């Protein structure tokens, strides 16, 4: 959060803490609305912080423990005891037309080969994939059963 947007360090620290605790889209929207009401238009770097917090919350609900990019691949590491519909794995992989694969192991992961254009906006691509995972793997748990509470 830039100093030009929120000048008071204590307020900035409290906002960062609240952003890090975002658990769902409603909480995300509440903080966005509050920031606009209190401080005006939200700068890009603060929106990125908010977007990453929401992605992390959504990934947690899908039992994703890590999202990372390496050598043209966007990787989604799953909690090894994830309570997912395993029948949805094949559907998810097929929906990406040969660009996604699932690797079973101590840390199962989905690996998506990105095209040249997709590499320019990794955050948005990760958001789309997590949304697809949420739908196709048909989560059979509540938020209370997510990764944070299993670790």
Positions of predicted regions on the chain:
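Accessory helical-bundle/CTD segments and flexible terminal tails appended to RecA-like ATPase motors
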Residues: 1-151
